[in-house]
Amino acid sequence: MKVLLLGAPGAGKGTQAQFITAAFGIPQISTGDMLRAAIKAGAPLGLEAKKIIDEGGLVRDDIIIGMVKERIAQDDCKNGFLFDGFPRTLAQAEAMVEAGVDLDAVVEIDVPDSVIVDRMSGRRVHLASGRTHHVTYNPPKVEGKDDVTGEDLIQRDDDKEETVKKRLAVYHEQTEVLVDFYSKLEGEHAPKYIKVDGTQPVEAVKAEILGALGK
């Protein structure tokens, strides 16, 4: 099963990715992890990517696609794989098809922006331990204080409303193009497109996704 998982930041993609990979016995592949592994291994593409990153540049699509092809040729991908956060752009999606990397399914976890903003902007974190609270759904015993240590909880910059809204705008801009691209593919290249309501309880989202994927 070769799956591309789409979902805005805060849509619950990480949780569902774990369920999908466990159900099908496939690895989760993210370009960030792949880049770090290739750089650590001293692979030629990894070294080329490191040079670009060190100079403050964006790694070119041809390098990313090359790494993806190498990664999915490994033994643990024989039953398939789950792409997380890749392809991000139309150019990457087109290059993947041209490189012969087809998908069985594109799964989009759909959550309204207002819900995402509420989920993320309400998060509060205890930096030293990583413990998280939510002002509405999981409030601390004392407002603004960690339950265990009594130390301050903070709102990360990434979770501030303005930042979340900007990230959502970028996500929609990129994803709409991808959804359009995959829905128009025909024949053997055409993946099944599955859109799931991500505002449901976690177990309901899991059941709907796995059911649609034939599990």
Swiss-Prot record:
It is an enzyme of class 2 (transferase). The keyword Nucleotide-binding applies. It catalyses: AMP + ATP = 2 ADP. Its EC number is 2.7.4.3. Keywords: ATP-binding, Cytoplasm, Kinase, Nucleotide biosynthesis, Nucleotide-binding, Transferase. This is Adenylate kinase. Residues 122-159 are annotated as: LID. Gene3D superfamilies: P-loop containing nucleotide triphosphate hydrolases.
